[in-house]
Amino acid sequence: MNKKKIISTILACAMLPFGGLISASAQDTKPTYVQLNPADASPFNNGEFQGWGTALCWWANRLGYSEKLTNAAAEAFFSDEGLGLDIARYNLGGGDDPTHNHINRSDSKVPGVYSDYKLSSDGKDVESITYDITKDQNQLNIAKAALKANPDLYFEGFSNSAPYFMTKTGCTSGGGTVNSDGTVTSNGKLNNLNDDMYDDFAKFIADATKLFKDNGIEFKSYSPMNEPDTDYWGYGSPKQEGCHFDPGAS
């Protein structure tokens, strides 16, 4: 048998079983019909899209220092002449411990809107917070320019973490085990909001929401947790703020 016949025979033998399988599979498979009802797609807002938009994190924190870039971005994203976005999610930063320098992205290091705070003598409660909205001036500049470009813009606030002094690890990047020598072993599967400070965190959100409203930005809805049931958010992460919550722990 010459070389060409050998190759032809091998190919024919190799293809026969597969051809049979394909044929049998096609004959045995019955069509499945799926009928979609768009009206029942979502129980929220009667199944209708409320709008379309973008989160301000963290490009607003990066661009907001420049009036030129701020206005250009607001027009491009939110005006009728641009994309016409009508929803904006505003990231209320927890604000990490000022002695920490592990978040190495300049845009994701979102400052908290406060300049000082005071804890109770046992450290279990927040007695007072001195608020300062100018700490988040860059993002605020973008939000105001966006509202000017689209007066009907819907703002939703959201938190990635509570302020560092409300967390178990003293870090807004996430959870971990606090060792006897004060060091922390990172563990993104551990809840990081201090058990005694759920009410304090809720008050922080309420106070900050009023602070923004008094400065022209009204949050019409608020998401207090962002992707909470993951193991992403560990102590000392270089990426961003984050806080794990077990289901039912919030």
Name the predicted role of every residue range.
Residues 24, 98-100, 232-235:
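Short acidic, Gly/Pro-enriched loop/turn segments at secondary-structure junctions
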